[in-house]
Amino acid sequence: MESENKNNNKKVKEESKVKVKFITNDANIRVTDTPIAVPVRLGRLGLSEVIHHLREEENETSKPFDFLINGKFIRTTLDKHIKNANLSEEQIITIEYLEAITEPKREKECQHDDWVSCVDGSNFGLVVSGSYDLGVRVWGYDGELISTGTGHLAGVKSVCWISDKNADNLSFVSASMDKTLRVWNFNKSQSEIKALACLKEHTGTIESVYVSPDSSRIVSASMDSTIKLWSIKDIPNQHATTSSSIEKSNSKKRRLANNTNNETAAVDQQSEIIHNITESLASVTVPNSQGVTVVNWTTQFQMLSGSMDSKIRLWDVSTLVANDTIPTPAPLTDLDYSMESGLIVTAHKDRIVRIWDPRSSDETKSQTQSLISHKTWVTSVNWNPSSKYHCCSTSHDGTVKYWDIRTKIPLYTIDTLEKSKDKVLSSSFISNKNKNINDYSIVSGGTDSKLRIHYNDKQEQQQ
């Protein structure tokens, strides 16, 4: 009899349950929010089966979900998670669920003649890439090469689309080791790239270029320790001719384009007429920076920079004064700002991805999280444009990692260069739908001279 009681007690313990209420922001997968009792031994897969049962989806039980309690992912059993979070099993626990993001299964490789150092997929369904082969290229969402532009005299380090309401004539800017910026026109109907202007004032390699949210200005950062602002209004559009007068701004006054001491017309390697601009709108030297590696915008009134002196700086655009400086533990190689959350994600030489809240008044608390998974130097970071939680990172370890900042473990890792010792240098998000986080795929480039588009499985199913 005593043995039977022990077995019964053991059985009761194994079947301990807790009352939970499931909630989601996705109406397509919503179930009843009436509290139900579930075994505390369940983990992510067991809870996924519960959701499928409530939705009466017997044929979709293999599709996993992710679950969060108070904003923290469940990565153990319910029992362990509840204890670690100091929650009570006597109360009803609210569990948020969402479709799990899985590793892309399809990939398109796009060959270059040298390292692919930079990519930008922010223009609807198009990717622009820059390479150490001196060229810039525009690719379609399907990985088809549309056009190539040449003119730089050294490797291209950074590229950025310039938003344009004209859907046929687009433009983008590139930055190079030849110390110049070039602005290009891309005519979609003619599948043709033409150079519009060459911006010359930096005295060192230009590491980063970015366009303001209102597409009125370009900011560039260089190893010469300067940040420069350029007015897009000063750059002739695709219809300009050699005889047109081009107005140029600077911080004190405006001069006409026929002043050949400041601007002249020149012919590049493709025999296209381009316009040399030799004075920026404004410039600032970042003292003791050891070189500025990256620039970005928060709004059209504020910029961000990262540098080799391990500091993030927030700049007032109107004065080019750094209103705030955030010290970091290691030199910065890249950063990105989230319009959704107001957070900054940074890449560092010490292999760590870090998340910062620039709104924090205490600089020791402004770092909200460290994401540690890469084995060596992190080269690029990007926020998913439609999510306050998701970002990607690339590294010299040959991987692309996709993160949800509510957990310290990557949602998935793409080993892009598993058969070689090549490095991943750059990344961006691309979409041809632009609706939500599931409509974005990742594009990356590296030292194997290939651009890769890692297609989001859910987006592919919607094509």
UniProtKB/Swiss-Prot annotation:
<keyword id="KW-0539">Nucleus</keyword>
<feature type="repeat" description="WD 4">
    <location>
        <begin position="287"/>
        <end position="325"/>
    </location>
</feature>
<dbReference type="GO" id="GO:0000466">
    <property type="term" value="P:maturation of 5.8S rRNA from tricistronic rRNA transcript (SSU-rRNA, 5.8S rRNA, LSU-rRNA)"/>
</dbReference>
<dbReference type="InterPro" id="IPR028599">
    <property type="entry name" value="WDR12/Ytm1"/>
</dbReference>
<dbReference type="InterPro" id="IPR020472">
    <property type="entry name" value="G-protein_beta_WD-40_rep"/>
</dbReference>
<dbReference type="InterPro" id="IPR015943">
    <property type="entry name" value="WD40/YVTN_repeat-like_dom_sf"/>
</dbReference>
<dbReference type="GO" id="GO:0043021">
    <property type="term" value="F:ribonucleoprotein complex binding"/>
</dbReference>
<keyword id="KW-0698">rRNA processing</keyword>
<dbReference type="InterPro" id="IPR019775">
    <property type="entry name" value="WD40_repeat_CS"/>
</dbReference>
<dbReference type="GO" id="GO:0000463">
    <property type="term" value="P:maturation of LSU-rRNA from tricistronic rRNA transcript (SSU-rRNA, 5.8S rRNA, LSU-rRNA)"/>
</dbReference>
<dbReference type="GO" id="GO:0005654">
    <property type="term" value="C:nucleoplasm"/>
</dbReference>
<dbReference type="Pfam" id="PF08154">
    <property type="entry name" value="NLE"/>
</dbReference>
<feature type="repeat" description="WD 2">
    <location>
        <begin position="151"/>
        <end position="194"/>
    </location>
</feature>
<dbReference type="GO" id="GO:0005730">
    <property type="term" value="C:nucleolus"/>
</dbReference>
<feature type="repeat" description="WD 5">
    <location>
        <begin position="327"/>
        <end position="366"/>
    </location>
</feature>
<dbReference type="InterPro" id="IPR036322">
    <property type="entry name" value="WD40_repeat_dom_sf"/>
</dbReference>
<feature type="repeat" description="WD 3">
    <location>
        <begin position="201"/>
        <end position="240"/>
    </location>
</feature>
<feature type="repeat" description="WD 7">
    <location>
        <begin position="419"/>
        <end position="463"/>
    </location>
</feature>
<keyword id="KW-0690">Ribosome biogenesis</keyword>
<feature type="repeat" description="WD 6">
    <location>
        <begin position="373"/>
        <end position="413"/>
    </location>
</feature>
<dbReference type="GO" id="GO:0042273">
    <property type="term" value="P:ribosomal large subunit biogenesis"/>
</dbReference>
<keyword id="KW-0853">WD repeat</keyword>
<dbReference type="InterPro" id="IPR001680">
    <property type="entry name" value="WD40_rpt"/>
</dbReference>
<dbReference type="GO" id="GO:0030687">
    <property type="term" value="C:preribosome, large subunit precursor"/>
</dbReference>
<protein>
    <recommendedName>
        <fullName>Ribosome biogenesis protein WDR12 homolog</fullName>
    </recommendedName>
</protein>
<feature type="region of interest" description="Disordered">
    <location>
        <begin position="241"/>
        <end position="262"/>
    </location>
</feature>
<dbReference type="GO" id="GO:0046689">
    <property type="term" value="P:response to mercury ion"/>
</dbReference>
<dbReference type="InterPro" id="IPR012972">
    <property type="entry name" value="NLE"/>
</dbReference>
<dbReference type="Pfam" id="PF00400">
    <property type="entry name" value="WD40"/>
</dbReference>
<feature type="repeat" description="WD 1">
    <location>
        <begin position="111"/>
        <end position="149"/>
    </location>
</feature>
<comment type="similarity">
    <text>Belongs to the WD repeat WDR12/YTM1 family.</text>
</comment>
<feature type="region of interest" description="Ubiquitin-like (UBL) domain">
    <location>
        <begin position="16"/>
        <end position="99"/>
    </location>
</feature>
<comment type="function">
    <text>Required for maturation of ribosomal RNAs and formation of the large ribosomal subunit.</text>
</comment>
<keyword id="KW-0677">Repeat</keyword>
